Each structure stands twice: as structure tokens, then as C-alpha cells.
């Protein structure tokens, strides 16, 4: 019984940590590649934060310093679902709205674009929510899927160097989707807890 007194708090701590991770499920992507490096530079051009809470995914695009999201296809994602609803749009520039599916020049077609009317008042932050209408996303890393050209996210960007030049950027390129290290961290904590439990049981 004395040994159980020590083991119980460890197991509770592991369970609580897992619960907290489930509550704060997110993944980040980087817009690393442009369709016109000679005009836009080499990047990175911005980040995309995907947060999944209670089945609702909040997608936040943040432009890197020196860039803004502009015009049609200001931002785009490839949603991992056959049906979904989009809403709760925010922009710190011109207002944005859903513009359905379409091409982001050089990076193929994305099934969900969010657009502005023009490039007169670009935004450094654009956010919106997605709700799956055809199933359940198991994690934030499961919300998006690679398009046929092997890109997850893209954006129409304008470089802030006085030229007004625009182009497109996307990322990540093909391969697997990162899970933010959550799986590895939880595995490490669990193994550590088991090791401590074994020590107490043997003593």
C-alpha cells in the first residue's frame, strides 16, 4: 500500500499531462517556398498555426516581417474533409471572405481559399475557423492534407519594399505532417513514469 501511495501521483500526473495536451492540440507550418524568388526573396514568408479545440479548427496565417497577404487567394489551405463550414474571419487589413476552391499560382489547387477584394490594404494576420462536416479530425495535424501538388498551405503575398510586387508562397513541401513533438514528449513522460514505478515496486 505504501508503494501505491507513491505510484498513484505519478500515474495521475501522466494522465493530466495527456489531458492538457489533448486540450491544447496545435501544429505550425511555414510558408517556405515562393513562385518568384527573384521578386519576393528567399523567405520564409510567414507561418500558419492550426489549433484544434472541441472539434473546431482555428487557422491563423501570420506574415513574416516585410510581407503582407493580399488580393484574391490571400491565403489558402487544403482541408482534409469532404465537407466543412468556414467562418469567424478576422483580418488586420482589408476584410476577407471564403472564395471556394482554386489555384495558387505555381502550387496547384487548394480546396479552400480566403480572399480580399484587392491589394490596397494587405494584412499581416488572417484567421478563420473550420468545422468538419464529414467526420472528426483526430488531431490538429489531421485537419489539412497535401494537395495534388504536395502542398498544405499557400498565400498570395506582397513584398513591402516599395515596388508593390506580389507573388505566391507555400509550404510545407510533401512528406509527412509534423505533430509538434507532442507524441515524442508524451512517450518520454510515460516511459519515465514507468521507470520510476518499477523502482518503487522493487524497493
Residue ranges and their predicted role:
Residues 25-176:
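Helix-boundary and membrane-interface capping/anchor signal
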Amino acid at each position: 500500500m505504501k508503494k501505491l501511495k507513491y505510484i498513484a501521483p505519478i500515474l495521475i500526473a501522466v494522465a493530466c499531462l495527456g489531458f492538457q495536451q489533448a486540450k491544447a492540440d496545435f501544429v505550425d507550418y511555414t510558408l517556405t517556398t515562393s513562385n518568384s524568388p527573384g521578386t519576393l526573396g528567399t523567405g520564409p514568408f510567414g507561418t500558419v498555426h492550426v489549433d484544434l479545440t472541441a472539434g473546431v479548427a482555428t487557422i491563423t496565417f501570420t506574415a513574416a516581417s516585410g510581407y503582407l497577404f493580399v488580393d484574391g487567394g490571400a491565403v489558402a489551405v487544403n482541408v482534409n474533409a469532404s465537407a466543412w463550414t468556414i467562418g469567424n474571419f478576422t483580418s488586420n487589413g482589408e476584410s476577407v471572405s471564403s472564395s471556394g476552391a482554386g489555384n495558387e499560382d505555381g502550387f496547384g489547387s487548394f480546396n479552400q481559399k480566403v480572399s480580399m477584394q484587392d491589394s490596397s490594404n494587405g494584412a499581416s494576420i488572417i484567421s478563420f475557423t473550420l468545422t468538419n462536416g464529414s467526420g472528426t479530425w483526430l488531431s490538429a495535424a489531421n485537419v489539412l492534407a497535401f494537395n495534388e501538388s504536395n502542398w498544405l498551405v499557400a498565400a498570395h503575398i506582397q513584398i513591402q519594399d516599395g515596388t508593390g510586387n506580389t507573388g505566391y508562397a507555400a509550404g510545407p513541401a510533401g512528406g509527412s505532417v509534423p505533430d509538434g513533438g507532442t507524441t515524442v514528449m508524451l512517450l518520454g513522460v510515460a516511459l519515465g513514469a514507468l521507470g520510476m514505478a518499477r523502482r518503487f515496486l522493487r524497493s
